[in-house]
């Protein structure tokens, strides 16, 4: 028997269990999985400033790139689309996968650390791979 849980849940519940992380090549996570978004009214300047102080720029960049893929592919909450970006000092790593229930297409690539279009480029690569594999999703 097995169950899939977020690692944060295991940590938060202080569970002493044996577990392993899923390889994103096997199961690409949902876009922006695990990212907490907070919004505030523009006229609440003290709240906006407090949020800016705790904002994680790397995570924000990763979420932005993942959203680029979702928009370019035409995905949404019910799309069988996984996207993951990791930004570090050496560059940007992106992986995206999509499935029709029988077949799966996964693409990945490295980008320059300042490439703000990495999400668009990965989406284009995924579309090309989908076309090559004959993978067409119903709208």
Named regions from a protein language model:
Residues 1-139:
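Small-molecule-sensing regulatory modules
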């Amino acid at each position: 028997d097995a169950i899939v849980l977020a690692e944060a849940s295991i940590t938060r519940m202080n569970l002493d269990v044996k577990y392993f992380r899923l390889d994103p090549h096997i199961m690409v996570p949902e876009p922006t999985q695990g990212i907490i978004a907070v919004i505030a009214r523009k006229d609440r300047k003290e709240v906006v400033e407090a949020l800016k102080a705790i904002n994680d720029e790397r995570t924000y960049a990763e979420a932005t790139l993942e959203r680029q893929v979702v928009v370019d592919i035409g995905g949404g909450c019910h799309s069988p689309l996984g996207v993951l970006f990791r930004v570090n000092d050496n560059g940007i790593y992106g992986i995206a996968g999509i499935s029709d229930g029988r077949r799966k297409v996964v693409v990945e690539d490295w980008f320059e650390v300042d490439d703000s279009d990495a999400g668009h480029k990965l989406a284009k690569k995924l579309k090309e791979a989908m076309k090559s594999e004959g993978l067409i999703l119903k709208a």
